[in-house]
Amino acid sequence: MKKKLSVLFTVFSFFVIGFAQIAFAADLDNGEKVFSANCAACHAGGNNAIMPDKTLKKDVLEANSMNTIDAITYQVQNGKNAMPAFGGRLVDEDIEDAANYVLSQSEKGW
């Protein structure tokens, strides 16, 4: 009986992990679409057309404490300085997907 439960648990674990990875990949795909449609005009390639020193590059995000999903999500929802707020224009899921995409791209060096 223990062996059957162990096998069942192992199969179930692989199933859950597989779907979690698919969902995460889909989030990055959506994040890229949201970023391209709403952010790329000012932030193409992780740059910043308005404030060139405030890029989305990994070292700059870290230096400005913007290297977490929560920090990026908050900034996108509420805006700051020249950056408009997108909280009323985009749903929370799209903003979080875009934040995940930004962090992923910053890790890859854009």
From Swiss-Prot:
Q: Which GO terms describe its cellular component?
A: chloroplast thylakoid lumen
Q: Tell me the GO molecular function terms.
A: electron transfer activity; heme binding; iron ion binding
Against PANTHER family, the record matches this protein to: CYTOCHROME C6, CHLOROPLASTIC
Q: Which residues bind heme c?
A: C39, C42, H43, M83
Q: After translation, how is this protein modified?
A: Binds 1 heme c group covalently per subunit.
Q: Where in the cell is it found?
A: Plastid, Chloroplast thylakoid lumen
The subunit structure is: Monomer.
State what this protein does.
Answer: Functions as an electron carrier between membrane-bound cytochrome b6-f and photosystem I in oxygenic photosynthesis.
Concerning NCBIfam families, the annotation shows: Cytc6PetJCyano (NF045930)
Regions crossing the membrane: none
Extent of the signal sequence: 1-25
What protein name applies here?
A: Cytochrome c6
**GO process annotations (BP):** photosynthesis
Instruction: Could you list this entry's UniProt keywords, alphabetically sorted.
Output: Chloroplast, Electron transport, Heme, Iron, Metal-binding, Photosynthesis, Plastid, Signal, Thylakoid, Transport
Main localization category:
plastid
For this chain, the family text in UniProt reads: Belongs to the cytochrome c family. PetJ subfamily.
